[in-house]
Protein backbone atom coordinates (compact mmCIF):
# COMPACT_ATOMS: atom_id res chain seq x y z
CA UNK A 1 0.00 0.00 0.00
CA UNK A 2 1.42 3.34 -1.04
CA UNK A 3 0.39 5.10 2.14
CA UNK A 4 2.29 2.58 4.28
CA UNK A 5 5.37 2.81 2.11
CA UNK A 6 5.27 6.59 1.84
CA UNK A 7 7.99 8.26 3.89
CA UNK A 8 7.85 11.66 5.45
CA UNK A 9 8.52 14.40 2.90
CA UNK A 10 12.14 13.95 1.84
CA UNK A 11 14.16 16.61 -0.01
CA UNK A 12 15.99 15.39 -3.12
CA UNK A 13 18.24 16.92 -5.75
CA UNK A 14 15.59 16.32 -8.39
CA UNK A 15 17.40 13.62 -10.32
CA UNK A 16 19.82 14.17 -13.17
CA UNK A 17 21.74 11.14 -14.40
CA UNK A 18 19.83 8.38 -12.62
CA UNK A 19 16.19 9.48 -12.88
CA UNK A 20 13.83 9.91 -15.81
CA UNK A 21 10.68 12.05 -15.75
CA UNK A 22 7.79 9.80 -16.82
CA UNK A 23 4.79 11.97 -15.92
CA UNK A 24 4.54 15.71 -15.27
CA UNK A 25 1.61 17.67 -13.88
CA UNK A 26 1.77 21.30 -12.78
CA UNK A 27 5.41 21.02 -11.70
CA UNK A 28 5.00 17.64 -9.97
CA UNK A 29 6.89 14.71 -11.51
CA UNK A 30 6.75 10.95 -11.40
CA UNK A 31 10.28 9.70 -12.02
CA UNK A 32 11.69 6.26 -12.83
CA UNK A 33 15.10 5.13 -11.55
CA UNK A 34 17.27 4.07 -14.47
CA UNK A 35 18.73 1.00 -12.71
CA UNK A 36 16.14 -0.27 -10.22
CA UNK A 37 13.08 0.66 -12.27
CA UNK A 38 11.17 1.92 -9.22
CA UNK A 39 9.30 5.22 -9.25
CA UNK A 40 9.01 8.24 -6.99
CA UNK A 41 6.78 11.31 -6.83
CA UNK A 42 8.38 14.75 -6.48
CA UNK A 43 6.65 18.07 -5.96
CA UNK A 44 7.64 21.32 -7.66
CA UNK A 45 10.38 21.82 -5.03
CA UNK A 46 11.89 18.35 -5.62
CA UNK A 47 10.54 16.97 -2.33
CA UNK A 48 9.68 13.27 -2.51
CA UNK A 49 6.15 12.37 -1.38
CA UNK A 50 5.79 8.74 -2.51
CA UNK A 51 7.73 5.85 -4.01
CA UNK A 52 7.01 2.40 -5.40
CA UNK A 53 5.35 1.53 -8.70
CA UNK A 54 4.07 3.98 -11.29
CA UNK A 55 0.42 3.32 -10.29
CA UNK A 56 1.37 3.91 -6.63
CA UNK A 57 2.81 7.33 -7.42
CA UNK A 58 -0.04 8.27 -9.75
CA UNK A 59 -2.51 7.33 -7.01
CA UNK A 60 -0.76 9.65 -4.57
CA UNK A 61 -0.60 12.44 -7.15
CA UNK A 62 -4.35 12.14 -7.68
CA UNK A 63 -5.01 11.89 -3.94
CA UNK A 64 -3.32 15.25 -3.47
CA UNK A 65 -5.65 16.72 -6.11
CA UNK A 66 -2.80 18.20 -8.14
CA UNK A 67 -4.62 19.65 -11.13
CA UNK A 68 -3.29 19.82 -14.66
CA UNK A 69 -2.39 23.30 -15.86
CA UNK A 70 -5.12 25.28 -17.60
CA UNK A 71 -2.57 26.40 -20.19
CA UNK A 72 -2.90 23.96 -23.05
CA UNK A 73 0.41 24.88 -24.78
CA UNK A 74 3.17 22.84 -23.16
CA UNK A 75 6.82 23.81 -23.69
CA UNK A 76 9.32 21.08 -22.83
CA UNK A 77 12.90 22.16 -22.16
CA UNK A 78 15.32 19.30 -22.85
CA UNK A 79 18.90 19.59 -21.57
CA UNK A 80 22.05 18.15 -23.11
CA UNK A 81 24.38 15.30 -22.21
CA UNK A 82 25.77 15.22 -18.68
CA UNK A 83 23.54 18.09 -17.59
CA UNK A 84 20.17 18.71 -15.98
CA UNK A 85 17.23 21.14 -15.89
CA UNK A 86 19.41 23.83 -14.26
CA UNK A 87 21.05 24.24 -17.69
CA UNK A 88 18.25 26.65 -18.56
CA UNK A 89 18.56 28.90 -15.51
CA UNK A 90 15.41 30.96 -15.06
CA UNK A 91 14.24 30.53 -18.67
CA UNK A 92 11.39 28.15 -17.67
CA UNK A 93 10.15 30.71 -15.13
CA UNK A 94 10.27 33.47 -17.74
CA UNK A 95 8.30 31.35 -20.19
CA UNK A 96 5.66 30.57 -17.56
CA UNK A 97 5.39 34.27 -16.73
CA UNK A 98 4.72 34.84 -20.43
CA UNK A 99 1.85 32.36 -20.39
CA UNK A 100 3.41 29.06 -21.49
CA UNK A 101 3.25 25.84 -19.48
CA UNK A 102 7.04 25.46 -19.54
CA UNK A 103 8.76 22.53 -17.82
CA UNK A 104 12.45 21.59 -17.84
CA UNK A 105 12.56 17.82 -17.68
CA UNK A 106 15.13 15.37 -16.30
CA UNK A 107 16.45 12.37 -18.19
CA UNK A 108 19.50 10.14 -17.57
CA UNK A 109 21.49 11.49 -20.52
CA UNK A 110 24.63 9.39 -19.91
CA UNK A 111 22.66 6.19 -19.20
CA UNK A 112 21.07 5.10 -22.45
CA UNK A 113 20.88 5.80 -26.15
CA UNK A 114 19.35 8.69 -28.03
CA UNK A 115 16.53 6.31 -28.95
CA UNK A 116 15.98 5.50 -25.25
CA UNK A 117 15.70 9.18 -24.38
CA UNK A 118 13.34 9.88 -27.27
CA UNK A 119 11.17 6.98 -26.07
CA UNK A 120 11.04 8.55 -22.61
CA UNK A 121 9.78 11.81 -24.13
CA UNK A 122 7.20 9.86 -26.08
CA UNK A 123 5.87 8.19 -22.91
CA UNK A 124 5.79 11.53 -21.14
CA UNK A 125 3.74 13.09 -23.96
CA UNK A 126 1.41 10.10 -24.15
CA UNK A 127 0.61 10.72 -20.47
CA UNK A 128 0.33 14.51 -20.79
CA UNK A 129 -3.01 15.84 -19.56
CA UNK A 130 -4.92 18.84 -20.91
CA UNK A 131 -2.36 19.58 -23.62
CA UNK A 132 -3.34 20.61 -27.15
CA UNK A 133 0.08 21.73 -28.42
CA UNK A 134 3.68 21.06 -27.45
CA UNK A 135 6.79 23.06 -28.38
CA UNK A 136 10.39 22.32 -27.47
CA UNK A 137 13.39 24.33 -26.30
CA UNK A 138 16.54 22.22 -26.31
CA UNK A 139 20.20 22.52 -25.44
CA UNK A 140 22.97 20.59 -27.20
CA UNK A 141 22.12 16.86 -27.45
CA UNK A 142 18.57 17.65 -26.34
CA UNK A 143 17.96 18.92 -29.87
CA UNK A 144 19.13 15.64 -31.36
CA UNK A 145 16.80 13.71 -29.07
CA UNK A 146 13.82 15.84 -30.10
CA UNK A 147 14.74 15.41 -33.76
CA UNK A 148 14.64 11.65 -33.16
CA UNK A 149 11.30 11.97 -31.36
CA UNK A 150 9.71 14.01 -34.14
CA UNK A 151 11.02 11.65 -36.79
CA UNK A 152 9.01 8.74 -35.45
CA UNK A 153 5.37 7.69 -35.83
CA UNK A 154 4.28 8.80 -32.37
CA UNK A 155 0.84 8.03 -30.94
CA UNK A 156 0.78 11.30 -28.99
CA UNK A 157 0.76 13.30 -32.23
CA UNK A 158 -2.79 12.13 -32.91
CA UNK A 159 -4.04 14.35 -30.07
CA UNK A 160 -1.23 16.86 -29.42
CA UNK A 161 -0.07 19.23 -32.14
CA UNK A 162 3.72 19.59 -32.44
CA UNK A 163 4.34 23.34 -32.35
CA UNK A 164 7.78 24.90 -32.71
CA UNK A 165 11.33 23.87 -31.87
CA UNK A 166 14.18 26.10 -30.66
CA UNK A 167 17.55 24.35 -30.62
CA UNK A 168 20.30 26.02 -28.56
CA UNK A 169 23.88 24.98 -29.46
CA UNK A 170 22.81 21.72 -31.14
CA UNK A 171 25.37 19.49 -32.91
CA UNK A 172 23.07 19.12 -35.92
CA UNK A 173 25.95 18.11 -38.16
CA UNK A 174 27.48 15.91 -35.48
CA UNK A 175 30.37 16.92 -33.26
CA UNK A 176 34.04 16.82 -34.21
CA UNK A 177 34.79 16.67 -30.48
CA UNK A 178 32.63 13.55 -30.09
CA UNK A 179 34.13 11.97 -33.20
CA UNK A 180 37.66 12.60 -31.94
CA UNK A 181 37.04 11.35 -28.40
CA UNK A 182 34.59 8.56 -29.15
CA UNK A 183 37.23 5.79 -29.47
CA UNK A 184 38.71 6.61 -26.03
CA UNK A 185 37.41 4.46 -23.16
CA UNK A 186 37.21 7.37 -20.65
CA UNK A 187 34.84 9.19 -23.02
CA UNK A 188 32.75 6.06 -23.49
CA UNK A 189 32.66 5.49 -19.74
CA UNK A 190 31.54 9.04 -18.89
CA UNK A 191 29.17 9.79 -21.77
CA UNK A 192 27.78 6.35 -22.46
CA UNK A 193 25.95 5.18 -25.55
CA UNK A 194 24.40 8.54 -26.39
CA UNK A 195 27.79 10.24 -26.38
CA UNK A 196 28.99 7.75 -28.97
CA UNK A 197 26.02 8.62 -31.20
CA UNK A 198 26.97 12.28 -31.64
CA UNK A 199 29.30 11.62 -34.55
CA UNK A 200 28.56 13.28 -37.92
CA UNK A 201 27.61 10.02 -39.64
CA UNK A 202 24.94 9.17 -37.07
CA UNK A 203 23.48 12.62 -36.41
CA UNK A 204 23.17 13.64 -40.05
CA UNK A 205 21.15 10.49 -40.74
CA UNK A 206 18.28 11.90 -38.66
CA UNK A 207 15.37 13.53 -40.53
CA UNK A 208 14.99 17.30 -40.58
CA UNK A 209 12.12 18.35 -38.26
CA UNK A 210 8.81 18.81 -40.07
CA UNK A 211 7.82 21.65 -37.74
CA UNK A 212 9.13 25.25 -37.72
CA UNK A 213 12.52 25.32 -36.01
CA UNK A 214 15.10 27.94 -35.15
CA UNK A 215 18.73 27.60 -34.09
CA UNK A 216 20.68 29.66 -31.57
CA UNK A 217 24.42 29.00 -31.74
CA UNK A 218 26.97 30.06 -29.15
CA UNK A 219 30.11 31.75 -30.38
CA UNK A 220 32.17 34.90 -30.62
CA UNK A 221 30.94 36.01 -34.02
CA UNK A 222 34.43 35.72 -35.52
CA UNK A 223 36.40 33.06 -37.39
CA UNK A 224 38.14 31.54 -34.37
CA UNK A 225 35.67 31.13 -31.52
CA UNK A 226 36.56 30.01 -28.00
CA UNK A 227 38.32 26.72 -28.71
CA UNK A 228 41.35 26.61 -31.03
CA UNK A 229 40.82 22.87 -31.48
CA UNK A 230 37.36 23.37 -33.01
CA UNK A 231 37.39 24.78 -36.57
CA UNK A 232 35.81 28.20 -37.09
CA UNK A 233 33.60 30.09 -34.68
CA UNK A 234 32.46 27.96 -31.75
CA UNK A 235 31.15 27.95 -28.18
CA UNK A 236 34.08 25.94 -26.87
CA UNK A 237 32.45 22.60 -27.66
CA UNK A 238 30.25 22.86 -30.76
CA UNK A 239 31.16 24.95 -33.80
CA UNK A 240 28.68 27.36 -35.35
CA UNK A 241 28.87 25.33 -38.56
CA UNK A 242 27.92 22.16 -36.66
CA UNK A 243 24.73 23.78 -35.34
CA UNK A 244 23.32 24.58 -38.78
CA UNK A 245 20.54 22.58 -40.39
CA UNK A 246 18.88 23.18 -43.73
CA UNK A 247 15.30 24.35 -43.40
CA UNK A 248 15.72 26.49 -40.28
CA UNK A 249 13.19 29.32 -40.08
CA UNK A 250 15.70 31.52 -38.28
CA UNK A 251 19.26 31.45 -37.00
CA UNK A 252 21.31 33.60 -34.64
CA UNK A 253 24.62 33.62 -32.83
CA UNK A 254 24.65 34.53 -29.15
CA UNK A 255 27.97 35.24 -27.43
CA UNK A 256 28.62 32.57 -24.84
CA UNK A 257 30.20 29.26 -23.91
CA UNK A 258 28.42 25.98 -24.58
CA UNK A 259 27.48 25.25 -20.98
CA UNK A 260 26.12 28.72 -20.26
CA UNK A 261 24.48 30.03 -23.42
CA UNK A 262 21.09 28.43 -22.59
CA UNK A 263 20.90 30.35 -19.32
CA UNK A 264 21.97 33.71 -20.74
CA UNK A 265 19.52 36.55 -19.97
CA UNK A 266 19.82 37.52 -23.63
CA UNK A 267 18.22 34.28 -24.76
CA UNK A 268 14.81 34.87 -23.17
CA UNK A 269 13.41 37.35 -25.71
CA UNK A 270 14.48 35.43 -28.84
CA UNK A 271 12.99 32.22 -27.44
CA UNK A 272 9.72 33.94 -26.57
CA UNK A 273 9.55 35.59 -29.96
CA UNK A 274 10.09 32.32 -31.79
CA UNK A 275 7.49 30.47 -29.74
CA UNK A 276 4.99 33.19 -30.62
CA UNK A 277 5.84 34.00 -34.22
CA UNK A 278 8.39 31.56 -35.60
CA UNK A 279 11.08 34.26 -35.82
CA UNK A 280 13.68 35.46 -33.34
CA UNK A 281 12.95 39.11 -34.26
CA UNK A 282 14.88 42.20 -33.34
CA UNK A 283 18.10 40.22 -33.06
CA UNK A 284 21.07 39.81 -35.33
CA UNK A 285 20.00 37.14 -37.82
CA UNK A 286 22.04 34.99 -40.16
CA UNK A 287 20.23 33.67 -43.25
CA UNK A 288 20.31 30.13 -44.53
CA UNK A 289 20.29 28.41 -41.15
Predicted regions and their residues:
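Flexible, membrane-associating and regulatory peripheral segments of lipid-active enzymes
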Residues: 1-75, 84-89, 93-103, 119, ...
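Serine-dependent carboxylesterase/thioesterase catalytic core
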Residues: 76-81, 96, 101-211, 235
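Short, solvent-exposed loop/turn segments at secondary-structure junctions
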Residues: 82-83, 110, 172-173, 219-223, ...
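Generic hydrophobic alpha-helical membrane-span motif
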Residues: 85, 146-148, 175, 241, ...
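Short, contiguous clusters of charged residues that form electrostatic/catalytic patches at enzyme active sites
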Residues: 86, 116-119, 123, 266-269, ...
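Residues that form or flank phosphate/diphosphate-binding pockets in enzymes
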Residues: 86, 112, 262
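Short aromatic-enriched loop/helix-cap "lid" or pocket-rim segments at secondary-structure transitions
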Residues: 89, 116, 175-181, 224-229, ...
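C-terminal catalytic-base region of ester-bond hydrolases, centering on the histidine
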Residues: 209-289
Amino acid sequence: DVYKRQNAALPTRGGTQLWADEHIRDGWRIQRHVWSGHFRLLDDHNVRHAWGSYPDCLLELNRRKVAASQNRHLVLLVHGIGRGPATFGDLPDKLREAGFEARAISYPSTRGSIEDHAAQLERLLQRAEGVDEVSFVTHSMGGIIVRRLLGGNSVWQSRIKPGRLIMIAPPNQGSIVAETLQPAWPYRLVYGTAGQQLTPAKVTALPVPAIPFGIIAGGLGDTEGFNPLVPGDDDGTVSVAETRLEGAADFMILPGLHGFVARSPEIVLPVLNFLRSGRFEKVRRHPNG
